Amino acid sequence: MTRKTLGAALITGLIAVGTGAAANEIASGELLAFQCAGCHGFNGHSVGPATPSIAGFSEDYFVQAMLDYKEGNRYATIMDRIAWGYSQEEFEAMAEFFAAQPYLPARQGFDADLAELGADIHDRYCGNCHSEGGTYAEYDSAQLAGQWIPYLEDAFEDFIEHGRPQPRGMQRRLADFSDADVQALIHYYASQQDPAAYVHAD
């Protein structure tokens, strides 16, 4: 199934749930989050390689991402249509729920040599914002480490080719990276599969 068709059958139902809840009272974050499980997995733990895990995400990052989808400010194949059916209050309820869930890195194969190169690239160019090797979801940046390789490839393509919103410094860095640099970073993030690495003291 392609990215364009992935989850398309869920869109009508998801929009109905969001709009119906908003018309009365805000449903619990857990109930709203349940509607995301078809693509993002139970409690935000993705089992589909084209879809990111969203458990443990920063609340502010989650809300802003959903607003960007809803307002057409972020490239999407499906999420813009899904986000349209929810209010900001519902985004905030979902964000609180997902932020409280433990992050489980994807178990997958990776190229160890590329991962070693990627670790050096990350430390030099990406670590100031994506701290702790990309395992730390605070500071309102995305969780990179432990995501599926196909999802990371799509995400980098969105940033580089489709103008996905990003900090100016990140935009400059990505413009300088070769395809090999990007692949090295992706395999570095994919290599981090120890769940203990994602537990950080606040």
Regions found by a protein language model. Name each.
Residues 44-74, 80-85, 119, 131-160:
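Gly/Gly-Pro-rich "capping" loops immediately C-terminal to redox-active cysteine motifs
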Residues 31-42, 64-67, 92-96, 120-132, ...:
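C-type cytochrome heme c attachment motif
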Residues 19-23:
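Sec/Tat signal peptide C-region and signal peptidase I cleavage site
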Residues 8-17:
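Bacterial N-terminal signal peptides
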Residues 1-9:
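Bacterial N-terminal signal peptides that target proteins for export
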Residues 24-43, 106, 110-133, 148-150, ...:
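Sequence/structural segment immediately N-terminal to covalent heme-attachment motifs in c-type
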Residues 45-46, 75, 100-113, 127-128, ...:
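Inter-heme linker and motif-flanking segments adjacent to c-type heme-binding CXXCH motifs
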Residues 84-106, 150, 173-201:
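C-terminal capping alpha-helices of c-type cytochrome domains
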